[in-house]
Structures are given as C-alpha cells and as structure tokens.
Amino acid sequence: LVFAEYDGKLGKAPLTQKAVPIALIMLANPIRKGAKETFSYFAKRGVEVKVISGDNPVTVSAIAKEAGIAHAERYVDASTLKTKDDYQKAVQRYTVFGRVTPSQKRILVQALKNERKTVAMTGDGVNDVLALKDADCSIAMASGSDAASQVAQLVLLDSDFSRMPSVVMEGRRVVNNIERTASLYI
C-alpha cells in the first residue's frame, strides 16, 4: 500500500498529475498453521478443493498455492461469468474463483452439484449464507457471523480449519456404524 501526495483532483479517473510517494506499508496475512497439512489430507483422499473468495483472483491464487492447494494456478475472475453455462464450464476448469459475490457463491455450489459432486462448504460471513444453505454439508466457524452459524449444519467451535480431517473421520465413523447397524436388520 503506497501513500502519496497528489495535487490533482481525485476521482474515479486515473491520476493525471505526478504523485509523490511518502509512505509504503507492507501487509501480509500468513497461511494458518496446519493449513498445508489439512489440504494435503484431502488431496490424498481425492477431495477436490475449490477456493471461492471476494478478493482479487490473482491474490487468492497466490495464497492458495502457498497453502498447497492443487491446481491453484487455475483461477478466474467471477465477474466475467455471465451465463449458467459459463459457471458450469468454470467449475470444471478452475480451482480458484475471485471477485465472487454472495449470489455467485450460491451459483457455484449449484454448478458443482450439477456435476454430481458432493459439496461441502466452509464459511464464516453473512456473504456465505446462501451458499452454505445450498451445500450438501455446510461448516461455519464459531468466530464468524451468527447468520453463518445459524444456517450451517456444523459449527467448528474453535474456528480451526485444521480440525477438518478429524471432523471427516468422525463423520465416516458415524456413517459406518449406521451401515453396520442397518445391515443387521436387513
């Protein structure tokens, strides 16, 4: 982020006069501890991870690469997606989606379901609510918005994404127990 002195008039148009930089601020948001291991766990089990964000797709792609998400270099600016067919092709082709609106998140979840994918979605903001409602499995972070927690099927109380492998293992254990019990009655 650069702060500068500018004598011209500021508006939506590009700057027309010389700007003199007076400060440079570097911002960084490090990858959370355990993220690489968590994504590796899912990759080894054939789980396809998609990253859907309202941020710049180039930035999101770089962060996804750093986190070890497979095919993170395949990104798209969601503002370029216009038709239902665009979304269907995009979920087949891309891993990272940037500049995504809340309604587009929902459309992307629906497009993945149209591909016969079982869709699990994590989210913590009001902007995630529509997509969380449509996902086959919705997971919210307790530290996020009340709205996301209310619509989610599962809330991570410690808001730690690295707990996801243990959540999946617990879910599989429950399903296996139900299947074993059901087979006794058949």
Task: Label each residue range with its predicted role.
Residues G46, G68, R116:
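Short glycine-rich hinge loops at helix-strand junctions in the catalytic core
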Residues G11, G68-A72:
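Proline-centered turn/helix-capping motifs that create local helix->coil transitions or kinks
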Residues F3, A19, F42, D55, ...:
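Residue-level signature of catalytic and energy-coupling elements of molecular machines
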Residues K36-T38, N56-A67, S103-A111, G125-A135:
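Acidic, divalent-metal-coordinating active-site segment for phosphoryl/phosphodiester hydrolysis
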Residues A13-T16, V129, D146, V155:
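A general structural signal for stabilizing positions within well-ordered secondary structure
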Residues L1-S61, D85:
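Signature of the cytosolic headpiece of P-type E1-E2 ATPases
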Residues H71-M121, G125, A135, A140-I186:
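Membrane-embedded transport module
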